[in-house]
Amino acid sequence: MEKPYAFTVHRVRRARRHRWRWAQVTFWCPEEQLYHLWLQTLRELLETLTSRPKHLLVFINPLGGKGQGKRIYEKKVAPLFTLASITTEIVVTERANHAKESLYELDIDKYDGIVCVGGDGMFSEVLHGLVGRTQRDAGVDQNQPRATLVPSPLRIGIIPAGSTDCVCYSTVGTNDAETSALHIIVGDSLSMDVSAVHHNSTLLRYSVSLLGYGFYGDIIRDSEKKRWMGLARYDFSGLKTFFSHHCYEGTVSFLPAQHTVGSPRDRKPCRAGCPVCRQSRQQLEEEQRRARYSLDGTEEVEEWKVRCGQFLAINATNMSCACPRSPQGLSPAAHLGDGSSDLILIRKCSRFNFLRFLVRHTNQGDQFDFTFVEVYRVKKFQFVSKPAEDEDSSVLGRGKKRLGQLCSEHPTSCCCRASSSSWNCDGEVLSSPAIEVRVHCQLVRLFARGIEESPKQESRG
């Protein structure tokens, strides 16, 4: 073969454990005319793929996790973006809420998406900036709990580089930077629910993963005081909170998700191309169409349920919350885009039983199969704590006198109760224990496709 002509095609190669790898194939042509024909045809085909981003805004948290965010982006992500002819504008954040403030000020219409390099905290900051900017531009008051929020046309890409990468792990199946970069390049799109958390008609925060009161709230509140410990603070605070074994009294009111398919205990996880999320999307579009043309204006009667008592933990998850330590997550069958949240109530129990409950999260066991655990799929919920001051003073006095004796005589069943806990909202502490939560169906989109079921593997890489 004289004067062969060659061109190289860059592609995605599937590896183990939901990881993707960059690969390339070189083609040789015997004739120059055929060579140019192939190049022209491939370029024309790529131009038709309008879902692929061409210009991205990238936020890098240089301090997240082990402080490797900038290095991870430069070594693993930037070269792939260059190969894909994606141009970027990079902002290295210098303070808390830098990314959020930037999204309120920048001209974001010129970008095809927003990329955040960091952990769940960095993603949350970008989420709040993008959702808040979209509502401001649309004239929607975020402080109104009944407001219908407007979804943003921009997608968010997550390059995992934090201490926790729960959102990335639950939407891609791994916390691997190269895999996430390739999902961005091919233009994947995944719609995801967002919960709005209010107190007294004031928006506190948005949540996409975990809202936790009691156990998880105490952990995050205690760990904030020990940032000098680094990542070890989470393990230390977790152990301390477990042995403290505090219970909190309150009332949970919730609106069951009547029209969603499935239940939290059906053992059917959310996967790529999920039919449950697809059906929810169709229902959402139908509701929007009816609202636009004022069809069937009668409002659905809301039948709220109420649960009272002493709780070790109250958790609400919009996704499985899977992570390397808990591969199945807090609620294995939670769906990313069905317009609902799985509300998990862990009532007062012994330390041993609570330990059994926690251990179930690390294996294939059903963590809801306990008499002290209740789980519901809900669209909205409210919580009001019962402060100690509301109790009868004589009962409270007698309790204080006998507290030490009871704890020493029954150490396994002791449930010392403080006045109130804090809410852990995607890793941030909320100021008020009394909250009102509403799930907004598929409010944001990610550069992801969901966890693929038994992906084909081309190698062991």
Language-model features: where?
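Residues that form ligand- and interface-recognition hot spots within folded domains
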Residues: 11-13, 29-33, 42, 46, ...
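Core residues of folded domains in eukaryotic genome-function proteins
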Residues: 3-7, 21-23, 52-58, 84-87, ...
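ATP/NTP phosphate-donor binding region
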Residues: 1-117, 124, 128-146, 453, ...
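ATP/nucleoside-binding phosphotransfer catalytic cores, i.e., glycine-rich phosphate-binding loops
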Residues: 1-30, 34-36, 306, 327-461
